Amino acid sequence: PSRLNPGDTYRLVFETSISTAATSTDINFYNTFVNDFANNASFNPVLASLGTTWTAIASTAAVDAQDNTGTNLTTDGAGVSIYHLNDQIVATGNADLWDGSIANLIRSETGGFDAAPVVWTGSTAAGVESIGLGLGRIN
C-alpha cells in the first residue's frame, strides 16, 4: 500500500469473485477455498505472486471470524492496517475491523462489487458467529 514505508506490516482483504456453498461446518473448508482461489494465477496473477496463506473472514459454530483471521483484539492485540487490493484502507487495525464500521467496503479481487447485496460469512459485524447462523448451520 502506498501509505506505508518499506518494512511496515499490513494485511490485505478481498472478496472472491466466485462463491461456494456455505454448507460445511469446517472452517478449513472456507480457508482452503479462499487460499486456493488467491493463489491461482488464472484468477489474479498479482495475488498469486504474493505466495501467501489466506484465511476466510468467516464464522462457524466452532470458530469466530476474528479468531480465524488472527484479528481478535483480546488475543491478537491491536493488529495492523488492512487494505483492499486497490490501495484503499479498510480498517486501521483489529478494533477498527470489528467495530461495525469499516472505512471502505471490501471489493472483489478485480476491484468491483458483488452483484449480490450481502456476502454470507456467518458472522456479525463484531467478527463472531451470528448465533445459529454460522456457516454450515443452514442447508
Regions found by a protein language model. Name each.
Residues P1-N139:
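Secreted/extracellular ectodomain signature
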